Amino acid sequence: VHEPVRGYGQACLRGLSALSAADIVVFLDGDYSDFPEEMPTLYEPIETGAADLVIGSRVLGQREKGALLPQARFGNWLSTCLIRWLFDVSFTDLGPFRAIDYTALKQLKMCDRDFGWTVEMQVKAARLRLRCMEGPVRYRKRIGTSKISGTVSGSMRAGYKILWTIFRHMG
């Protein structure tokens, strides 16, 4: 599937539009940072009926030195604390490697077209009281430079967007 318009959420929406049917959808980055062989950690709790959404937590798993930059670690901490406080659902990460039941995903009516996609999914799942859990995943340095966490301005834009997304879905 090719998506000419930039944006993480846009790419995810394009991929979803190409699906004809699915039971479980797994999302992961294509920049070499995730380990695809760890997918069972994420989809098996959904297959067994234990969860609707499973986030691959880079915080709970092993990370290559320098793979999760300080600004990303701080942003994760702040965002997950806010989600816990506002929605009473505990996460340690907003990481992109995740699995979700397809029926649950459709209920979320995802619409964010850029880097608010992951937090939008988690906040909407929390509001709908979906069964959410995390599984530890390994994380390595990506290939190339991130447009988000690789620059100060990108990190600030991402932080603003993530916080805005959390507060937008409060009420």
Predicted regions and their residues:
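Acceptor/aglycone-binding surface of glycosyltransferases and processive sugar-polymer synthases
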Residues: 3-6, 10-19, 24, 36-115, ...
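Acidic metal-phosphate-binding loop of nucleotide-sugar-dependent transferases
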Residues: 32-34
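Short glycine-centered, acidic/aromatic-flanked micro-motifs in structured strand/loop junctions
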Residues: 2, 30, 137-139
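Cell-envelope/extracellular polymer assembly enzymes that use nucleotide-activated donors
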Residues: 120
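Catalytic donor-sugar/metal-binding loop of nucleotide-sugar-dependent glycosyltransferases
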Residues: 89, 113, 123-140
